[in-house]
């Protein structure tokens, strides 16, 4: 039995862009102006190169064997290609979202860092995560009774099911209720205290994901969580985005009255090779994110394949920060 899917047209909003249409103005040879997307990519014979104003002065490249899909949804450009070294690759608006080789690191950590930190989570909300990888990981927890998921872009869901079946296997779980719509609006309409955990699997704070990094969104998350409930959100790279991380930490310390922590992990195909997570809990039962208390019963989720990255040791290690980041993040506690 597959996941239930509903379409919430009242939750759907048009693609929003930053100033100047979310674009960089480029000058052509004849002097005319043209626009490039805020995140853009190029293919120079046989290579995909990822560039963005979020990491200026550098590019991240993979050798392309074959382009498998290229489309444009209401919200973003979607590309899937077969790479020479990382398997199939999903790209949104010119930015790599996952590869078959290293997706396990991100999906497992963003899911199990929060869910292994609280006893017996039953009801979970996933915002974003259209590829289905977080659903696959949430489903490993036998205590889960309901998984609500709100993804704004149905094309991402459909493309993942077609090209990344081992990732999108989470959609086959009958506990999943999929809503195609805007996660910001979905949370505003959620009943107060209705979730044990919220996982925000967003892209970078450009275009359709921008609101998922702002204070009103975090306030909606806190309202939707039960006392002692937890949230884990994608929180950028400490090598590239300390200014963004500072803002996220400040907002979360103001809004969440329980525990507030920053963790990070290695994902080779993400910019700088690492990605961070913000983990917070609401006021209520104490949550010690650094010491997992709810181990995964892998025997209950054999159909989802074995864990490839997460374990209890790497869980605790994820909260060990380099000195430069620790200094900045801890300063926000005051």
UniProtKB/Swiss-Prot annotation:
Signal peptide: none annotated. The active site is at 201 (proton acceptor). The keyword Transferase applies. GO terms for molecular function: spermidine synthase activity. It comes from the Eukaryota. Gene3D superfamilies: Spermidine synthase, tetramerisation domain (2.30.140.10), Vaccinia Virus protein VP39 (3.40.50.150). Residues 1-35 are annotated as: Disordered. It is an enzyme of class 2 (transferase). Putrescine binds at residues 106, 201-204, 270. Homotetramer and heterodimer. Component of a multiprotein complex. Interacts with SPMS and SPDSYN2. Belongs to the spermidine/spermine synthase family. This is Spermidine synthase 1.
């Amino acid at each position: 039995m597959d996941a239930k899917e509903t379409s919430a047209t009242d939750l759907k909003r048009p693609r929003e862009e930053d100033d100047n249409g979310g674009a960089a103005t480029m000058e052509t040879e004849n002097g005319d102006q043209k626009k490039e997307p805020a995140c853009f990519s190029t293919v120079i014979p046989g290579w995909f190169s990822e560039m963005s104003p979020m990491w200026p002065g550098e590019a991240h490249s993979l050798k392309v064997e074959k382009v498998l899909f290229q489309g444009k949804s209401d919200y973003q450009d979607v590309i899937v290609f077969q790479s020479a070294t990382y398997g199939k690759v999903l790209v949104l608006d010119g930015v790599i979202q996952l590869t078959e080789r290293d997706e396990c690191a991100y999906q497992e950590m963003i899911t199990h860092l929060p869910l292994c930190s609280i006893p017996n989570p039953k009801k979970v909300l996933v915002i974003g995560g259209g590829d289905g990888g977080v659903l696959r990981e949430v489903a490993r927890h036998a205590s889960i009774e309901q998984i609500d998921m709100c993804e704004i872009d149905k094309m991402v869901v459909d493309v993942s099911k077609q090209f990344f079946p081992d990732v999108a296997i989470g959609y086959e779980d009958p506990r999943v209720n999929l809503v195609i719509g805007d996660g910001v609006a979905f949370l505003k309409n959620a009943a107060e205290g209705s979730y044990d955990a919220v996982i925000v699997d967003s892209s970078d704070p450009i275009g359709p994901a921008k609101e998922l990094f702002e204070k009103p969104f975090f306030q909606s998350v806190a309202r939707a969580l039960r006392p002692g409930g937890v949230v884990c959100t994608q929180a950028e790279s400490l090598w590239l985005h300390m200014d963004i991380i500072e803002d996220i930490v400040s907002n979360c310390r103001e809004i969440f009255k329980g525990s507030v922590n920053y963790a990070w992990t290695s994902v080779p195909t993400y910019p700088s090779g690492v990605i961070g997570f913000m983990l917070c809990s609401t006021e209520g039962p104490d949550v010690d994110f650094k010491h997992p208390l709810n181990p995964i019963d892998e025997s209950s989720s054999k159909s989802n394949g074995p864990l490839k990255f997460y374990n209890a040791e790497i869980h605790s290690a994820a909260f060990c920060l380099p000195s430069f980041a620790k200094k900045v993040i801890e300063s926000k506690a005051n």
